[in-house]
Regions:
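Pre-Walker A adenine-sensing motif
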Residues: 1-8
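Surface-exposed acidic, glycine-flexible loop patches that form ligand/cofactor-binding
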Residues: 5, 36-38
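Conserved P-loop NTPase motor module
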Residues: 10-14, 171-223
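Conserved P-loop NTPase motor cores
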Residues: 11-36, 49-52, 62-159
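Short, structured coil segments at secondary-structure junctions
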Residues: 40, 57-59, 130
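Conserved catalytic segments around the Walker B and adjacent sensor/switch elements
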Residues: 40-47
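A structural signal for isolated positions on well-ordered beta-strands in alpha/beta enzyme cores
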Residues: 45, 109-111, 176
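Helix-rich interaction surfaces within compact, conserved domain-sized segments
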Residues: 145-191
Length: 223
């Protein structure tokens, strides 16, 4: 796997998190028109909350207001976008089935757009643990989320992800991308600039050296 053949895999889900006006929806629109999926989607279903569909008309999406009881009628090889439906979906069992079962059985790609990475319910935690890709947008008002993720991913070097996030999100509307798929090499888990128009892609790696009486320590380096 290299930066030249990077693709998003079918049968996966993505969590896009950040505050209002961070650039989440714009990122998803650009993602959906890019050529970085490893299959050709048959349909794009966009589920939204509230009464507004501003910016969604004319893009070829199949628009749905609110959440259905289940997603059994979504055809295979489709993309499903859940746009800021965290309140409606907090305890929605059908939504959890989408993340844990249907996404794999139907080779779907599910994108969950939310303002809060950590939502306090059993259902949302199950969905989060079954998410393969994470996009964290710059959030000056809450840096604790990236601290917690960093401690979970790199318990031996908990400040690594925090430092990387500062580097990746220096500019407004910037983001950090995490690839949590089982088969992804460790050196390619943390990136930014993944969209084709943003290339060159940036990859953030830990470099391990033997120092201090032979103990292996993690040294931060950005590539």
């Amino acid at each position: 796997m290299t930066i030249f053949n990077f693709t998003l895999k079918g049968g996966s889900s993505m969590l896009v998190s950040g505050p209002t006006m961070a650039g989440k929806s714009t990122f998803v629109h650009k993602l959906l028109t890019s050529k970085i999926f490893d299959w050709q989607p048959t349909n794009i279903y966009w589920y939204y909350g509230g009464d507004t569909i501003e910016g969604l008309d004319g893009r070829g999406y199949i628009l749905r207001q609110g959440l259905p009881d289940n997603f059994l009628d979504v055809p295979p090889n489709s993309i499903v976008v859940l746009d800021d439906l965290m309140n409606e979906g907090k305890d929605h069992a059908g939504l959890t089935d989408l993340f844990t079962k249907l996404v794999h059985h139907k080779n779907l790609f599910v994108i969950n757009i939310t303002q809060n990475f950590f939502q306090n319910s059993k259902e949302t935690r199950t969905r989060r643990l079954n998410t393969q890709y994470v996009v964290m947008f710059k959030n000056p008002s809450d840096v604790t989320q990236i601290h917690i993720i960093g401690r979970q991913m790199y318990p031996g070097n908990p400040t690594f992800l925090t430092s990387v996030n500062k580097n990746a999100t220096k500019k407004p509307h910037s983001y950090l991308f995490l690839d949590l798929r089982q088969e992804t090499p460790e050196d390619y888990r943390v990136r930014s600039h993944i969209l084709p128009h943003e290339f060159p892609m940036r990859i953030y790696k830990q470099v391990l050296d033997y120092i201090h009486y032979g103990k292996r320590q993690a040294i931060r380096k950005f590539h």
